[in-house]
Curated annotation (Swiss-Prot):
Classification lineage: Bacteria, Thermotogati, Deinococcota, Deinococci, Deinococcales
Residues that coordinate or bind GTP: 19-26, 89-93, 143-146
PANTHER family for this protein: RIBOSOME-RELEASING FACTOR 2, MITOCHONDRIAL (PTHR43261:SF1), TRANSLATION ELONGATION FACTOR G-RELATED (PTHR43261)
Pfam family, any one: EFG_III
GO molecular function: GTP binding; GTPase activity; translation elongation factor activity
Protein name: Elongation factor G
Keywords of this entry: Cytoplasm, Elongation factor, GTP-binding, Nucleotide-binding, Protein biosynthesis
Entry's family note: Belongs to the TRAFAC class translation factor GTPase superfamily. Classic translation factor GTPase family. EF-G/EF-2 subfamily.
InterPro entries recorded: EFG_II, EFG_III, EFG_III/V, EFG_IV, EFG_V, EFG_V-like, EFTu-like_2, G_TR_CS
One cellular component (GO) term of this entry: cytoplasm
Amino acid sequence: MTTKAQSYLTHFRNIGIAAHIDAGKTTTTERILYYTGRTHNIGEVHDGAATMDWMEQERERGITITAAATTAKWKRSGTNEEYTINIIDTPGHVDFTIEVERSMRVLDGAVAVFDSSQGVEPQSETVWRQADRYGVPRIAFANKMDKTGASFELVVNDIRERLGAIPAPIQYPMGQENEFKGIIDLVRQRAYTYTNDLGTEIQEHDVPAEYADKVAEMRAQLIEAAAEVDEDLMMMYLEGEEPSVEQLVAALRKGTIDKKIFPVLCGSSLKNKGVQLLLDAVVDYLPSPLDIPAIKGTTENGEVIEYPADPEGKLAALAFKIMADPYVGRLTFVRIYSGTLQAGSYVYNASKDKRERVGRLLKMHANSREEVTELKAGELGAVIGLKDAGTGNTLIGDGDTRVLLESIDVPEPVIKLAIEPKTKADQEKMGIGLQKLAEEDPTFKVETDQESGQTTISGMGELHLEILVDRLKREYKVDANVGAPQVAYRETITKPVDVEGKFVRQSGGRGQFGHVKIKAEPLEPGAGFVFENAVVGGTVPKEYIGPAQKGIEEAMQSGPMLGFPVVDMKVTLYDGSYHEVDSSEMAFKIAGSMALKEAVQKGAPALLEPIMRVEVTVPEEYMGDIIGDLNSRRGQIQGMEARGNAQIVKAFVPLSEMFGYATDMRSMTQGRASYSMFFDHYSQVPNNLAQQLMKK
């Protein structure tokens, strides 16, 4: 790699701002855009004008739905070095976890924003775990330090206790709640106060005397934490030497990139305090594309290839989001891991096995855009002109060996609704609109019942589907009626069986013949479907194995109990027979389907239901009512935890029992409780209930 390319990549940061729904994430992103000069006036979420929240509904609801990728420039304070920071705004609402998943997949580092008065909330925990899964280094920002009940210590302790991570506070607040007036940098031992409301005039001075002891104590702890992850610093520490600022920053950077420690900062985005220091910390501690491990791809014969970040290397890019844009049509957001993507060139979509032409390339600002001729390794941008690329698809150079990059985990939908247009004339328009929305969002599924012709949509929660029905109305001008929410059950088998499927049709001339023998066995919950080909001696020829598997998979889409998909089982195709003339792919597909249907019938089928992890934050005096009510909903109480003067009740409750819970909870507690709910796992429905459901 040339020195120029290296220097260019060193000055790059791809980060996400990840947080709980009201921790102030969009406001923090807004401030970053304001101070980096990308927006000339500050957009406030609570007056509906935020730049990042650019879908109409997001502005109305004050929540962020779609992760928009924005490019900003920042000069590190006290230096002349300019950095490019790509920010991916991620939604904090649990119904949109796929958006968080996709963004985690393409980020190099993240800023986790916490509400200082609330500490680590349930959704923050979910987002943190996703970042753990994708190995994303993080710095934490204790926001809302000016709010009543704000406590920097609460955030630091919660990171340690609730997240099991090692926090490394690199700042300390001067005052809390309405006394919050500035920030002390523990690394450089300087204090910063703000002299105007916009936060653009910052005064730097010595640490005030009343904070001297606290700062000395916390700085000693910080050096100790850094020494744990850096051997050179450990030697100095043991010999009682004081490290220089540069040595301390280097050690903290190393520890952060290795995900061993997590620097913690503080501020108030709404009051414009601490955001510039946060940007400096993004530059100081979060990785550039050169600091993260090279992305790995797998060839068709299982060989693993590494793609280091190098603009002159072979092209490897991941499509992480599809959006329909009213002006230019379909936008495919991509992260370039290696090589350079040129406008007007051809690429090979390895996931779909298709050659595609790249039209124009755009770099996005929250809702304006800049056209570019190329996107290089380490960059994020949007492509116009790709017709087939979907979320998680791998794009490589035209003519290169087929390689697949690790894709994105797509959770299964847990809730479904029947939907129909208010007027018959809109039927076709509704079909097109739903199909386009499903292309953008892989957790949204559209199905039409073959017998009744009824269309159902399924997704990750009530809010998720409500927003998609709303988009159908706004963007595709289709008014739709929706039914009551239904639970997306699953079916499975509970005992192993051995069955065969034989399809024989003799009707003058060429007949049809397909015959397979399969073993079906239950797997543990969440294991999905596993197919094994154990045919020996060619009793089922190789070319018929694929069609038989396809028949099996298609038959699994509708189980015998209530017609829900069959999951968590392993099918082994071990024998069968064929006919030289009459056998065909179609015959084996039907035989596979017949065998599977019989296997599920004989395998003591059971119904599975989604179980949600519910956390209710409730004042002490209503706790008994809340627990009694959750028990009556077949809930299993997992524990309680005191938080301030409230209690957090944690429970597992079946989704079918949680519809309309918000209203009941409010009336039980006079509106003083709040709750959050996430899908956790599937579990078997008790027999008596399964019987009732089947009678309906």
